[in-house]
Amino acid sequence: MKIKKGDEVIVIAGKDKGATGKVKKALPKEQRVIVEGVNLIKKHKKANQAGGQQGEVVTLEAPIHVSNVALLEDGRPTRVGYRFKEDGTKVRISRRTGKEI
């Protein structure tokens, strides 16, 4: 998966189109990412009688498919590619500028 934890991304499709945020968590097996402040859902939490905890409604960030986000570079969306350095290490590059990410 080309998007990693800590990357700054923009949502390019869906109800939050145009929103930007940092990737909090990448889920490569599911091809999804969790982005800060994007795709917010409300989850009802059950009350716990034994612990004395009240029921509440919690707002959480739901995972969004990786095809619906693009990496941001200098405020503009870009695609990600890979190159090998002279020493053989694989690095991510920006398809827009060709620079190493």
Curated annotation (Swiss-Prot):
Pfam families: KOW, ribosomal_L24. GO terms for molecular function: rRNA binding; structural constituent of ribosome. CDD domains: KOW_RPL26 (cd06089). Coiled coil: none annotated. GO terms for biological process: translation. The keyword Ribosomal protein applies. It comes from the Bacteria. GO terms for cellular component: ribonucleoprotein complex; ribosome. Keywords: Ribonucleoprotein, Ribosomal protein, RNA-binding, rRNA-binding. InterPro entries: KOW, Rib_uL2_dom2, Ribosomal_uL24, Ribosomal_uL24_CS, Ribosomal_uL24_KOW, Translation_prot_SH3-like_sf. One of two assembly initiator proteins, it binds directly to the 5'-end of the 23S rRNA, where it nucleates assembly of the 50S subunit. HAMAP family: Ribosomal_uL24_B. Belongs to the universal ribosomal protein uL24 family. NCBIfam families: rplX_bact. Part of the 50S ribosomal subunit. This is Large ribosomal subunit protein uL24. It comes from Thermobifida fusca (strain YX). The gene is rplX.
